[in-house]
Amino acid sequence: TLLYTPPPTAMLLGVALIGYTSAKLDGRFFLPYFVAIVKSADIGAYCLGTLFAKSPMGSHKFVPEISPKKSIEGLIGGVLLSLSVGILGALYLPNVSDAMLILGSNISGNIEVGRIVGAAIISLILCLLSIVGDLVESIWKRDSGIKDSGSYIPGMGGILDVADSLLLAAPFMYAITLTLSRF
């Protein structure tokens, strides 16, 4: 499983370093923005999924053969929280806001609406990629007969379980950051 982590990790560093090569973007804002969107998908999924699992209504399993605890309610919670974080970041983080203006002006005639729509699209794609990354890592663990990928982070299953949602989303964020740096 260590073979698939270096390229996305390098792309995370690329997101942070693009700011040094572009006068328009500052990667110091894009890296936390990216991580906040992706991890908020994890947090939203966990919170809403757990809430519904404990409720009388119960939860509806998403992909029980891959990851038995994942639910549709958790998926919805992850999408909603990551959209909220992405839009708020696009509105209030100085450099991210400027980049979303670039994106927004290409999406809509109304720059503010375009900024929000651009942030929502990026956030939704990052959220979905983070979910797929989590599922891919779960498949690899199940194929290897491993339940937890380590004990460095108690209660979370290990380092790879924390990083899995970042692995597929990192290349997309790198491409977006690189593209926006050229405008």
Residue ranges and their predicted role:
Residues 1-168:
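Interhelical loop and helix-boundary elements at the membrane-water interface
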Residues 175-183:
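Juxtamembrane boundary at the C-terminal end of a transmembrane helix
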